[in-house]
Amino acid sequence: MTQDELKRLVGQAAADYVIQNVPEGAVIGVGTGSTANCFIDALAAVKARYRGAVSSSLATTERLKSHGIKVFDLNEIESLQVYVDGADEIDASGAMIKGGGGALTREKIVASVADTFVCIADASKRVPVLGAFPLPIEVVPMARTAIGRRVTALGGVPVLRVTKDGAPYITDNGNEIIDVKGLQIADPRGFEAQVNAWPGVVTVGLFAERGANLCLLGTPNGVETIVYPA
């Protein structure tokens, strides 16, 4: 199977999971990125079962609305049973690097209030140690250089994310992103807390404190379901 076929496979598997585990009339939390888009496309076929969705980005909101799925502001929702999203990397504990699509802050907010985080990914995203994929850090623009110095002191290589025309990439929240190369993150939870404590960091794309509860992993032999201990 191609990577796109694996993404569609796990997108459908996530929709099947929601149908089997989330009652009708609920609101679904939805992530951002190409794999999350496959879930949205599969969810559209059963959209009548659910009130709608909470979105983690403007791009996801647009795709949900294109399928006629109602989008709620998180502040309107009392509880969220499930959040479905992809990952750039996931380790054996369910800790992830996320934010390749630029939506890490809103993804982390929505994930934090969901009862269950379902990660959907192809098998290439499963790694023994996080860090081969550059770690995104969303920063207040004036703190960009200061945060870069802190990253360098820890052995990382900070790279400002830019658009095709070379301008700084701006998140939905009006901030910038530093992508950090060259890390091997042996303690994801500790490193997440350390970076989040730096003044000027909005959030780091480590999802360890709130990792995945389960992962639907697309493999050439089908979908593998991995459940992580609480």
From Swiss-Prot:
Decide whether keyword Amino-acid biosynthesis is in the record. no
Question: What processes does the entry annotate via GO biological process terms?
Answer: D-ribose metabolic process; pentose-phosphate shunt, non-oxidative branch
Pathway terms, separated by semicolons = Carbohydrate degradation; pentose phosphate pathway; D-ribose 5-phosphate from D-ribulose 5-phosphate (non-oxidative stage): step 1/1
Top EC class, one word:
isomerase
Catalysed reaction, written as an equation = aldehydo-D-ribose 5-phosphate = D-ribulose 5-phosphate
Residue numbers annotated as active site: E107 (proton acceptor)
Entry binding sites for substrate: T32, G33, S34, T35, D85, G86, A87, D88, K98, G99, G100, G101, K125
UniProt-listed Enzyme Commission number(s): 5.3.1.6
- Tell me which InterPro entries the record gives: NagB/RpiA_transferase-like (IPR037171), Ribose5P_isomerase_typA_subgr (IPR020672), Ribose5P_isomerase_type_A (IPR004788)
User: Where does it sit, as one GO cellular component term?
Assistant: cytosol
Q: Name one GO molecular function term.
A: ribose-5-phosphate isomerase activity
For this UniProt record, the keywords arranged alphabetically read as follows:
Isomerase
Q: Which PANTHER family does its entry note?
A: RIBOSE-5-PHOSPHATE ISOMERASE
Describe the function of this protein: Catalyzes the reversible conversion of ribose-5-phosphate to ribulose 5-phosphate.
Oligomeric and partner information: Homodimer.
Q: Which family does it belong to?
A: Belongs to the ribose 5-phosphate isomerase family.
**What protein am I looking at?**
Ribose-5-phosphate isomerase A
Q: Which organism is it from?
A: Burkholderia ambifaria (strain ATCC BAA-244 / DSM 16087 / CCUG 44356 / LMG 19182 / AMMD) (Burkholderia cepacia (strain AMMD))
Q: Which gene encodes it?
A: rpiA
